[in-house]
């Protein structure tokens, strides 16, 4: 959620930043709604003060009867009625909060202006792409290996699901353990095993609700399946005041993730790129406003390390204003090279959300010896999605005979297996 005080004091800049997100100017409407709310709040405070004064006089009167006493009682009763009506008006005046809840985060000054991914800015590349490399797509390879099943899985769950078997299931498990080990041992992230069913308020805190309600799966009893472990991890500091010396807090978690893929009809309908259920290792950092820019680079580098150790070519893109996520003020996308598609595809998003999520979930910190609190900054990064990483390994490590060479760093995690070959039932 955006800071209403900042909007109040920076109307023109607010409208300019909204325009960068391709949203029409809204400062005038917000000013009107904010003015109405502040007027009601001011009246409530005045009546509360008047009630306090009159109640004190009543309490100090020697005689608890007579015209003066009864007149003061009538005044207090009238004030209570006014207060009840005003407080009801304030509770019913939800339009301002509803409007603020629909605004995305304000883009950082470094974010390039643009409508879509074509305007994203290249930051750096890693590794060499080979235009003459073998170029079967991952699903062709997986099906030929008899270790990736879409057809039978569709009978169980429908489209956009997959069943992995044998050594591909083992590769999935190896990747999870490898990624967690790297992030905990080399990058100082603390491992968490969080719930994957969360309440709506947790989704709201992370910026998933109300705007993206249709993109998640809701149960019939008030829970939602998480679209990313970011939801569970950032909420670990909801409604808390953290001592400054404990920051930064860095969490890593592996979870299954669930997305309805609303609006993705016709996109990536084959294979494992876009599934309703997928596994992902997620990184979350909680830090101070002064350190969040450096922490953004840190968490991005942690994600990159996985691809570097797997020797997979990739590039880092700075997303433009029109391509950023709702809660982000600045995002790097990491895109891995897929020979089967002959293009880079997103494998990780690394975002600095500033105090956007913290304001929603009331997550603050304070210096030692101080009573003043400040909103924390939250950051998140994929570290990485297991399925898409497996896609990249299959396509970049494929051999002429359809077998898959295991990357060196995974051989121990695979129990010494160096190559995945076709499974014969």
From Swiss-Prot:
Binding site for L-serine: 228-230, 282, 382
Domain of life (superkingdom): Bacteria
GO terms for biological process, alphabetical: selenocysteine biosynthetic process; seryl-tRNA aminoacylation
Pathway noted in the entry: Aminoacyl-tRNA biosynthesis; selenocysteinyl-tRNA(Sec) biosynthesis; L-seryl-tRNA(Sec) from L-serine and tRNA(Sec): step 1/1
Record: residues binding ATP: 259-261, 346-349
EC number: 6.1.1.11
Keyword set includes ATP-binding: yes
Enzyme class at the top of the EC tree: ligase
Annotated GO CC locations: cytoplasm
Recorded GO MF terms: ATP binding; serine-tRNA ligase activity
Xref: Gene3D superfamilies: Bira Bifunctional Protein, Domain 2, Serine-tRNA synthetase, tRNA binding domain
Signal sequence coordinates: none
InterPro entries hit by this protein: aa-tRNA-synt_IIb, aa-tRNA-synth_II, aa-tRNA-synth_II/BPL/LPL, Ser-tRNA-ligase_type_1, Ser-tRNA-synth_1_N, SerRS_1_N_sf, SerRS_core, tRNA-bd_arm
Compartments, record wording: Cytoplasm
Catalytic activity: tRNA(Ser) + L-serine + ATP = L-seryl-tRNA(Ser) + AMP + diphosphate + H(+); tRNA(Sec) + L-serine + ATP = L-seryl-tRNA(Sec) + AMP + diphosphate + H(+)
Keywords: Aminoacyl-tRNA synthetase, ATP-binding, Cytoplasm, Ligase, Nucleotide-binding, Protein biosynthesis
Family in the record: Belongs to the class-II aminoacyl-tRNA synthetase family. Type-1 seryl-tRNA synthetase subfamily.
Role, per record: Catalyzes the attachment of serine to tRNA(Ser). Is also able to aminoacylate tRNA(Sec) with serine, to form the misacylated tRNA L-seryl-tRNA(Sec), which will be further converted into selenocysteinyl-tRNA(Sec).
Note on domains (UniProt): Consists of two distinct domains, a catalytic core and a N-terminal extension that is involved in tRNA binding.
Subunit: Homodimer. The tRNA molecule binds across the dimer.
Listed name of the protein: Serine--tRNA ligase
Gene (UniProt): serS
